[in-house]
Amino acid sequence: MTVAITQTGPALQEFVERHQRLFVLSGAGCSTDSGIPDYRDLQGGWKRPQPVTFQAFMGELSTRQRYWARSLVGWPRFGLARPNATHHALAALEARGQLELLLTQNVDRLHQAAGSQAVIDLHGRLDVVRCMGCEQRMPRTEFQLLLERDNPGWADLEAAQAPDGDADLDNVAFDNFVVPACPACGGVLKPDVVFFGENVPRERVERAFAHLQAADAVLVVGSSLMVYSGFRFVQAAARAGLPIAALNFGRTRADDLLSLKVEQSCAQALAFLQQPPDPLHTATARYHSARSA
């Protein structure tokens, strides 16, 4: 397939206007304007060491000590993040009645904070902590109090923000860091997110695929799609013959599957969604779409 690449928004606006049941797949690029760093460079490679795996977190106390120490320092800023123009634009798309589903790979809940309701958090949510033993859950804000209680002085450390709500703590020893256990059963507590090496819950995947089957097009926003758990939805859309557009700087894993690729700021490219739709423009776009179908 020959991909249409543009540096401007009109082609994307036309793509959106001619579809009524968009399946939107969002990634870390949506939240960078909210102060949350992304993971990948323009070639799709890691900007920093790969995140902790599920197996290491569950199997090694030292990994949990390092993870929760970094999280203790990084959480306050992450928890204060607020939706940006991209989140509000996608909420406006839903308000227009053109959204089938917003499937987000992000764990920050900023889409919901912006007003989006038809959202599935593919990789879970960082504002909840889950016991891997008894399945009890608690708010991350409540767990922060336990972390600070058991580790006085750590909250005062300064460090650069990292993508997973943690912080880049360098030259710090974690051996004496105390990781609180589940208050109910003494089990291992883990953020309620899907780690690398961990499976996305089947029910969540099946719900997302059901919405994909009802969609008439796919729009990828702020994702390189390098993680298979998100990429597989674009693969399925391509097999079904759905038009696919991507709004993302740099290479994506799906470049050869795209109908349209826009390399522009997400907020700038989607700004038209926060303006009243132009009936003539919309009608023209849908007319041309019907003729080409």
UniProtKB/Swiss-Prot annotation:
The UniProt entry's GO CC annotations, sorted and at most eight, read: cytoplasm
**Known cofactor(s):** Zn(2+)
Record text on cofactor binding:
Binds 1 zinc ion per subunit.
Where does the UniProt annotation locate this protein?
Cytoplasm
Tell me the superkingdom of the source. Bacteria
User: Can you give the residue ranges of the Deacetylase sirtuin-type domain?
Assistant: 1-284
Q: Which residues bind NAD(+)?
A: 27-47, 105-108, 222-224, 248-250, 266
List the EC numbers from the record: 2.3.1.286
The residues the record assigns to binding Zn(2+) are C131, C134, C182, C185
Which cysteines link up through disulfide bonds? none
| PROSITE patterns, per the entry | SIRTUIN (PS50305)
**Pfam families cross-referenced by the UniProt entry:** SIR2
Task: Please list the residues that make up the active site.
Answer: H123
So what does this thing catalyse? N(6)-acetyl-L-lysyl-[protein] + NAD(+) + H2O = 2''-O-acetyl-ADP-D-ribose + nicotinamide + L-lysyl-[protein]
MF terms in GO: histone deacetylase activity, NAD-dependent; NAD+ binding; zinc ion binding
List UniProt keywords, sorted A-Z. Answer: Cytoplasm, Metal-binding, NAD, Transferase, Zinc
Task: Tell me the protein family, please.
Answer: Belongs to the sirtuin family. Class II subfamily.
Q: What does this protein do?
A: NAD-dependent protein deacetylase which modulates the activities of several enzymes which are inactive in their acetylated form.
Looking up NCBIfam families in the UniProt record yields: PRK05333.1 (NF003738)
Output this protein's name: NAD-dependent protein deacetylase
Q: Please state the gene responsible for encoding this protein.
A: cobB
